[in-house]
Amino acid sequence: MAKGVNQIINNIRLRKLRKILNQINALSEEFSNFSDEALQAKTKEFKVYLNDNKASLNHILPQAYATVREASKRVLGMYPKDVQILGAIAMHQGNIAEMQTGEGKTLTATMPLYLNALTGKGAYLITTNDYLAKRDFLEMKPLYEWLGLSVSLGFVDIPEYEYAENEKYELYHHDIVYTTNGRLGFDYLIDNLADDIRAKFLPKLNFAIIDEVDSIILDAAQTPLVISGAPRVQSNLFHIVKTFVETLEKDKDFIVNFNKKEVWLTDEGSEKASHYFKVNSIYQQQYFDLVRMIHLSLRAKYLFKYNLDYFIFDGEIVLIDRITGRMLPGTKLQSGLHQAIEALENVEISQDMSVMATITFQNLFKQFDEFSGMTGTGKLGEKEFFDLYSKVVIEIPTHSPIERDDRPDRVFANGDKKNDAILKTVIGIHETQQPVLLITRTAEAAEYFSAELFKRDIPNNLLIAQNVAKEAQMIAEAGQLSAVTVATSMAGRGTDIKLSKEVHDIGGLAVIINEHMDNSRVDRQLRGRSGRQGDPGYSQIFVSLDDDLVKRWSNSNLAENKNLQTMDASKLESSALFKKRVKSIVNKAQRVSEETAMKNREMANEFEKSISVQRDKIYAERNHILEASDFDDFNFEQLARDVFTKDVKNLDLSSERALVNYIYENLSFVFDEDVSNINMQNDEEIIQFLIQQFTQQFNNRLEVAADSYLKLRFIQKSILKAIDSEWIEQVDNLQQLKASVNNRQNGQRNVIFEYHKVALETYEYMSEDIKRKMVRNLCLSILAFDKDGDMVIHFP
């Protein structure tokens, strides 16, 4: 019923898009008769029209799309099909376009990118990795340049590349920019740490199309981008605590909730810890760090799996994205968790760094005036797209009917029997020369199947996070005659698998999946590697009762039935009742997994709200300071009065010694005035005296700065230094606070309310501390000039 209603709604949306498509098609013959020069001149015509008439882009959409369509035929030899035009219209309108694998999303995106770039405000194509961004940029660059638009790759594809001055500015200030979500996110954070307007390089974020949008803003929504700062004081407890944790008994000394990714000590475990570390109670305030370390070690040991969440490369822990199967180089878990895993695996423990700046992908893309996206699996996430981003998913029909045969699951009582059946199936397919792609949940399983196939003289390519460098080549070869490719779920997205004619004739690509993934979108994405653009092919998932999905998310005890384990596998597999029960168990487990993941993303979004509001305020204030041409209207005396009024109220400045010490610490390193004539019982008199000292010291610094530009830079840097030092500390505190409340049992308190309450309190304290540091910086900084005559500021 619901499916039928959704289809009706989708058809209504498509009907509206088709009206615009008809307008574009009506222009096709006219535009095909244009000379190259006339077609190229359209770009300038559109820009002039938009500027002179203050018209919306919708007014010129039909002509603009007709222009790109015709230009694409002439420059690239590709003429966008009607279904691609529908997807392009949907994305310009800010929707998510669901387009199946092989339907030409790269070409589809050129139309809304071109249209939105005509405003002069820029447009971005954002994808998941460097390879795809560079590939799409190189393929589409000739089209944009032929039409008179500038286009760039938003990064230099050289490892450890150091950008020259203004190089990033030049990369980003093009009409169209191709980049990745990770690179844009880090650049956004770096740009907002600039202490000079000339060091900023990002333009205002106008319009973006996100490729594989569900992967980026749903699946990766909880992953914060973090810029690290100074190292924290390194704890020497990691190895000691690891040894203690190995003595604990699960369910007796500690409880693990795998689904919520929580772990906590029981009363017995707490007593055992107190005895082990020879303290009265580990919950005394002075042992807070010990308790934190115990929780970190438990999480590392029981919530993170080798070859699923991380692997070891060159003596370092490298994280893996569970959903995509891709490695996350340069990314570290925060708040000591990364170091706990390092201790667990006996590799060198790295420095735990403080957090300077952080943002989630959810909030990064909310910085754009508008964004849309495209994916092959959007409909299954439609509710979440709407709830989090107010985005509608429109299912775009395929150009050719999908010929892929998605076969029913094959079911087994246990993993050993299932694995034997998978190997027999792959060998059987290989004997027909039909190519096969075997996809596994973990790298460990992929390595197992690859090795077993080699033992049986079946050559195969192994694609896991550790050898991602060969990904494009392996995927390109996966559709060739007799090819066998074993891969993790990282094979589910990216480069298309193209079939040779011989392969097309013998049934296309066979996709074998060794178990259902945690969400049905990933299952569908993996199946979609076969059957692109009407190609033949088939997919099949193999299931057992001890699959990770079933063990983690199902409360069924069917797997414990001893009779099942001893029954003949072929008889069991042919049992309609058994298949029905297993299908029900798997479907329910996957549904619970999806609902839990959604709740976790909602929780992460709730946590992010406080820091998001605070970050927006801080960044807006920083930009206001950076863009100021003077500070004539800034009331420095009121700033000083606010600080001194609070300090006189909260600090004991009623003695001459206390007042003089306060001046030394906040206003002047050299002070020899007589304060005996000040009435120490009169707060206003003390405040007035402090304001006089502030004004004198501040003016002294301005005199050293000499000209108006240097005075401006001194004030800007003094204020920014105060903001940044306090904001960095606030961000780091909020990260640790979030980790702290996540370790507590949710049933005992409303952790979200608790987090926001503390976050607001600390923000208010931070705001006062910023003012105090501004006063200190304006009065105590030492200004000097280097041999080139450039001003150097030494802050207190």
From Swiss-Prot:
Keyword Transferase: no
Membrane topology, from the record: Peripheral membrane protein
Gene3D superfamilies: Helical scaffold and wing domains of SecA, P-loop containing nucleotide triphosphate hydrolases, SecA, preprotein cross-linking domain
EC number annotated for this UniProt entry: 7.4.2.8
Binding site for ATP: Q84, G102, E103, G104, K105, T106, D496
Molecular function GO labels: ATP binding; protein-exporting ATPase activity
Catalytic activity: ATP + H2O + cellular proteinSide 1 = ADP + phosphate + cellular proteinSide 2
SMART domains: SecA_DEAD, SecA_PP_bind
PROSITE patterns recorded: SECA_MOTOR_DEAD
Compartment list: Cell membrane; Cytoplasm
One Gene Ontology CC term in the entry: cell envelope Sec protein transport complex
InterPro entries associated with the record: Helicase_ATP-bd, Helicase_C-like, P-loop_NTPase, SecA, SecA2, SecA_DEAD, SecA_motor_DEAD, SecA_preprotein_X-link_dom
Leading EC class: translocase
GO biological process: intracellular protein transmembrane transport; protein import; protein targeting; protein transport by the Sec complex
Entry keyword set: ATP-binding, Cell membrane, Cytoplasm, Membrane, Nucleotide-binding, Protein transport, Translocase, Translocation, Transport
UniProt subunit comment: Monomer and homodimer. Part of the essential Sec protein translocation apparatus which comprises SecA, SecYEG and auxiliary proteins SecDF. Other proteins may also be involved.
Job of this protein: Part of the Sec protein translocase complex. Interacts with the SecYEG preprotein conducting channel. Has a central role in coupling the hydrolysis of ATP to the transfer of proteins into and across the cell membrane, serving as an ATP-driven molecular motor driving the stepwise translocation of polypeptide chains across the membrane.
Record PANTHER family: CHLOROPLAST PROTEIN-TRANSPORTING ATPASE, SECA INNER MEMBRANE COMPONENT OF SEC PROTEIN SECRETION SYSTEM
Protein family per UniProt: Belongs to the SecA family.
Protein name: Protein translocase subunit SecA 2
Organism: Staphylococcus epidermidis (strain ATCC 35984 / DSM 28319 / BCRC 17069 / CCUG 31568 / BM 3577 / RP62A)
Lineage, opening ranks: Bacteria, Bacillati, Bacillota, Bacilli, Bacillales
Gene from which the chain derives: secA2
